[in-house]
Amino acid sequence: MTAAQFTNVTVNAQATISYDGRCSSHTIMFEDGRHKTLGVILPCDNLVEHYHFSTNTSERIEITSGECEVKINGEEEFSYYRAGQSFVVEGNSGFNLRTEQIVQYICHLEG
């Protein structure tokens, strides 16, 4: 279930920006030590067919708006996800993501 807002958190004001500004995220830290990132991904186009993201720890990516296709390392096909859905990527892995619209997400760092 998507949270509309988070309370009692510290936010890293410096964004993580990749793909020439097409992808950006901010880390939020909870009092109990948990971390999440909140991010925005802009649509792919003729310059960027898909984005590739690497993971250091297990992550659950929750799509909060938009829709996209995701192919986790080792999978043969892309899978479709839309707002309200999520997917899990193991640590020390990665995934490709392609989209034709703006996607917003919450990355739950689970490792």
From Swiss-Prot:
Say which domain of life the source belongs to: Bacteria
What molecular function does GO assign, one term?
thymidine phosphorylase activity
Against InterPro entries, the record matches this protein to: Ppnp (IPR009664), RmlC-like_jellyroll (IPR014710), RmlC_Cupin_sf (IPR011051)
Coiled-coil segments: none
Pfam families the UniProt entry points to: Ppnp
| UniProt EC number | 2.4.2.1, 2.4.2.2
State the GO CC annotations: cytosol
Q: Does the keyword Metal-binding apply?
A: no
Which controlled-vocabulary keywords does the entry list? Glycosyltransferase, Transferase
Q: Which reaction does it catalyse?
A: a purine D-ribonucleoside + phosphate = a purine nucleobase + alpha-D-ribose 1-phosphate; adenosine + phosphate = alpha-D-ribose 1-phosphate + adenine; cytidine + phosphate = cytosine + alpha-D-ribose 1-phosphate; guanosine + phosphate = alpha-D-ribose 1-phosphate + guanine
Instruction: State what this protein does.
Output: Catalyzes the phosphorolysis of diverse nucleosides, yielding D-ribose 1-phosphate and the respective free bases. Can use uridine, adenosine, guanosine, cytidine, thymidine, inosine and xanthosine as substrates. Also catalyzes the reverse reactions.
Family statement drawn from the similarity comment of this UniProt entry:
Belongs to the nucleoside phosphorylase PpnP family.
Q: Could you tell me which PANTHER family the record lists for this protein?
A: PYRIMIDINE/PURINE NUCLEOSIDE PHOSPHORYLASE, PYRIMIDINE_PURINE NUCLEOSIDE PHOSPHORYLASE
Instruction: Provide the protein name.
Output: Pyrimidine/purine nucleoside phosphorylase 1
Query: What organism does the UniProt record list as the source?
Result: Psychrobacter cryohalolentis (strain ATCC BAA-1226 / DSM 17306 / VKM B-2378 / K5)
